[in-house]
Amino acid sequence: MAGNKTILVVDDDMELSDGLRVVLEKQGYRVLQARDGQQGKQMVYQHRPDLVILDMMMPRMGGYPVLEHFRDKPEAPPIIMITANEGSRHKAYAEYLGVVDYIRKPFAMERLLDSVGKALNPQEPETESKEE
């Protein structure tokens, strides 16, 4: 259940960002939007979202500097990275920096909603497909 959870979408592609906002709001989430990593970083401190959906490649400041900034900060919300980049080393670095999920564009909205649900409700048991 979305309840009163707030999600910050940080993406310079406003068409995608607006689409995510519409879908997430229909699920009951409050959605904030930022156009680049610098604005997104400021909004994390201002609004304290419960989750951030972060694009990797953006003008001014991309996703990696945002991840690096929040890596060891206790106030950091969980972050889902979305990207059109195919490189496995990019995924490995994002995971090293602490993303809860790494989703390649284009993606099925159900895939993102599943990831959002898991990130916001980590106490729910996961399937046994994870590494042991």
Per-segment meaning from a language model:
Residues 47-53:
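Active-site beta3 strand of CheY-like receiver
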Residues 42, 64-75:
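Short amphipathic alpha-helix used as the core "switch/output" element in two-component signaling
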Residues 21, 65, 86-101, 114:
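Alpha4 helix (beta4-alpha4-beta5 surface) of REC/receiver domains from two-component response regulators
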Residues 107-116:
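C-terminal output helix
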Residues 35-39, 61-65:
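Acidic catalytic/metal-coordinating carboxylates
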Residues 58:
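Receiver (REC) domain active-site loop signature in two-component systems and cognate sites
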Residues 18-26:
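Charged docking surfaces used in two-component/phosphorelay signaling
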